[in-house]
């Protein structure tokens, strides 16, 4: 399963940006270099993005630990644990998601559909707004403000702010979940 997840990471990184670029190229005649905004690759917006992503990830993590979420049938941390990922895998997947998804949604789609619709679509496509699992949808309502804020940040700080925030958010949560999974696994072995 781990190899499949790493493959999905590569697909996200390399293939997700293509439809966004095609939209921008066809309708706005934007080159690939303009699409990835290399001219905006600056330390300050990236640092702001990392700070914001880390901060919001800690808030989301605290909410995810609330007893309310104990009754979710399949918890995200259990899914991550079952993938047998290392922290390095989690960081790689975070980078893939940050770059691939932000180039697709923020850089590609958002200029056509607007911030609010694109943000809701982004959260819904991740499965976090699920009418059949209202308890899990509460997590979607926790992550939606984060996505809205980085979406609005695109105009002021650029795409690399969005990528950095998304990467940092995912990296913190992946790291927590991977470490917790290994800790609970070692605790279970001690009981045997």
What are these regions (language model features)?
Residues 5-6, 37-42, 114, 133:
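Alpha-helix initiation/capping motif
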Residues 22-97, 183, 190-192:
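Juxtamembrane helix-loop-helix connectors linking adjacent transmembrane helices
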Residues 1, 31, 39-42, 135-137, ...:
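Serine/threonine-rich low-complexity intrinsically disordered regions
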Residues 16-20, 170:
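Helical transmembrane-bundle signal
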Residues 1-13:
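N-terminal membrane topogenic signal
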Residues 81-192:
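Transmembrane helix-loop-helix hairpins at the membrane interface
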């Amino acid at each position: 399963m781990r190899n499949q997840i790493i493959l999905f990471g590569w697909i996200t990184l390399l293939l997700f940006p293509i439809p966004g670029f095609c939209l921008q190229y066809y309708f706005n005649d934007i080159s690939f270099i303009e699409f990835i905004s290399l001219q905006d690759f600056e330390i300050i917006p990236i640092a702001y993005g990392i700070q914001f992503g880390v901060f919001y990830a800690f808030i989301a993590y605290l909410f995810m630990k609330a007893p309310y979420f104990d009754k979710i049938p399949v918890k995200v941390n259990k899914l991550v644990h079952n993938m047998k990922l290392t922290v390095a895998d989690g960081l790689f997947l975070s980078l893939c998601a940050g770059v691939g998804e932000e180039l697709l949604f923020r850089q590609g789609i958002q200029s056509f559909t607007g911030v609010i619709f694109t943000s809701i679509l982004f959260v819904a496509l991740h499965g976090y707004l699920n009418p059949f699992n209202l308890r899990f949808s509460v997590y979607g309502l926790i992550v939606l403000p984060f996505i809205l804020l980085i979406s609005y940040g695109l105009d002021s700080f650029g795409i690399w702010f969005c990528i950095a925030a998304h990467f940092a958010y995912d990296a913190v949560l992946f790291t927590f979940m991977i470490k917790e999974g290994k800790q609970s696994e070692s605790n279970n072995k001690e009981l045997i």
